[in-house]
Amino acid sequence: MCLDIWRHKKKVLPLLLLMAIGSIIYYLYTLKLEGERDESATSTTSRLERDIRDLQAVFESEVIPDLGALGRPARGNWTEEQLEAIAKSQRETGYNAWLSKRISPERSLYDMRHRSCKKLKYPMEKLPSVSVVITYHNEEASVLLRTLSSLRSRTPIQLLREVILVDDGSTQADEKLNDFIKIKFLNMVQHRRITTQVGLMHARVVGAELALADVLVFLDSHVEVTKGWLEPLIAPILEDNRTCTTPIIDTIDFDNFAYRRGKPSRGFFNWEFNYIQLPLLKEEAVAMPAPHKNPIMNGGLFAIGREWFSELGGYDKGLKIWGAEQFELSLKLWLCGGQILEVPCSRVGHLFRDGNFQIRYTNKDKNSEKKLISRNYRRVAEIWLDEYKDKLFANMPHLTVIPVGNLAEQRDLKNRLHCKPFKWFLDNLATDFLNLYPILDPAEYASGVLQSISSPKLCLDRKDPSHGQPKLAPCSSDHVFPSPEQYWSLTNHRELRSGFYCLEVRNHGVNVHIYQCHGQSGNQFWSFDSKTHQVISGQQQNFRHCLEAQPELNAVTSSVCDPKNHKQQWKFGYLNSQRLQHFWDNVKTQ
């Protein structure tokens, strides 16, 4: 038996030896492979770091540390040459692109949320996932990078499924920028380029069709999101999947990139399809910062369920390039079973361009572009305003001769979704709007030209309200029914109105500007003293400023009222003397 055991061991020992040698060889081979992998990973990491450094040298080399930090105004002692570069960049983009390159894309922002917003907790495991859709056309690289950087650093990673970046036919496409975005933001950004510009609405639809998350968040390409912006924005959609939400839109100044607090408001449009903002209703103001109803959204920044957006048909496919899309989608939401809420606990800064900058959305001439926008207006009016479109057409008669295209698909959608009539919208969301912008306008206190008595050949003129200041110009031949630019009315709301623009004072009553009528009195309150012929701003009786002609400059200013100052004397084309006697009835004076 011992001999058998010995023979068995003699057979097994060589086998064990071979197995040991094999294990050693395998171990050494594995070590070699791991070393090669480590070298490869190190090489890849080094190459990635090198690429980032090279591209940072292109896009971030001019950054000045702490410039514009915490959203403070970015200022410096610029040379004459630099000031010329600043002016050039503002002419080309409508904002200080030169300065933007010198502000870090990762700059900090002050937390402007209401204190109660900071205490709110959200069920993160239940909140829906989000696809952020950003479209752009020839956007300044530093501005776009700041938008993306703020998203990456201030958005919970577990909620952000993707950022879909749609280049809408930029003529200044930059492959290095695309590479930098791909490397810097890794898998966060999905980049899609459309070779020929299709416009805001269609580019957004392209992005929405690529999206995979439960909720779509549409943002402009020149924004900065703030701390805690996303959770409150999407929480109402968790409660009701037919809710669309909008954040408070803070302002980023075009000239120094200062981040300024925006106010809660309710969006609307007037009877010339200008977007306007109305104050919160009393009960909404008391409930702040709770979400409140928003009749018409601004359109640039909003969140909506992906399936609900699809069910609504997205944007009307007949709308071209830009214009009226926020009216169309807002009306469709409210009238077809949804709602829009503004969420004060969510704040996003928006870079607003210089008011004098004329944005071009196409390569077409200016008149062709205006026709496209007018066509959009008419399509929205024909589908959604019902009989109230006549009020719009009375103020915008040129719309009636604009070809509107085929409306069958939109009418079918309206019927299929059992959408309510526009009257429901007015009755339920617009009671204060109708007081400010009635279907039938009440009698005016005075109207026609506003003629300078000291320079009787000159009248107040608003030829180009986008420039922000009125001027003096030769009077129209008809003083009662002059040209639209010289037709002013002292309205039932004590405004000095021309069309949908009002005269207002700024800088403690010194400067006179033209701005969209806001219906809140204040700096747009005016009265007329028929005895002294003075046009007086404000409701204060003890410290009054009057409109004053500056004929040598073809301008107007405001200064302390002086009955002996002939430059402060004016004459309306028509004066309703009997109605003017009751001007101060029911007006609170200070």
UniProtKB/Swiss-Prot annotation:
Its cofactor is Mn(2+). It is an enzyme of class 2 (transferase). The chain crosses the membrane at residues 12-31. Keywords: Disulfide bond, Glycoprotein, Glycosyltransferase, Golgi apparatus, Lectin, Manganese, Membrane, Metal-binding, Signal-anchor, Transferase, Transmembrane, Transmembrane helix. Disulfide bonds join 117-345, 336-419, 459-475, 502-517, 546-561. SMART domains: RICIN. Residues 446-573 form the Ricin B-type lectin domain. It comes from the Eukaryota. This is Polypeptide N-acetylgalactosaminyltransferase 8. The lineage of its organism: Eukaryota, Metazoa, Ecdysozoa, Arthropoda, Hexapoda.
